[in-house]
From Swiss-Prot:
GO terms for biological process: translation. The keyword Phosphoprotein does not apply. GO terms for cellular component: ribonucleoprotein complex; ribosome. HAMAP family: Ribosomal_bS21. This is Small ribosomal subunit protein bS21. PROSITE patterns: RIBOSOMAL_S21. Keywords: Ribonucleoprotein, Ribosomal protein.
Length: 71
């Protein structure tokens, strides 16, 4: 859980904004949403495999664009 120490003479709004930003970077909300319901192990494996395929396709697309610019 991210924590934020409020500095002297720091407005509450600024501290709250820093806390929200640290929660976003840590992925707290996405983790909570993901754990709201039970996900079967097969569904977890399927989701991770689909994410890996998507990452690989994205990587290939970036490489192709890079080589296109060279010519």
């Amino acid at each position: 859980m991210p924590s934020v120490k409020v500095r002297d003479n720091e407005p509450f709004d600024v501290a709250l904004r820093r806390f929200k930003r640290s929660c976003e970077k840590a992925g707290v909300l996405s983790e909570v949403r993901r754990r709201e319901t039970y996900e079967k192990p097969t569904a977890v494996r399927k989701r991770k495999a689909a994410a890996a395929v998507k990452r690989h396709a994205k990587k290939l697309q970036r490489e192709r664009k890079r080589f296109e610019r060279l010519y």
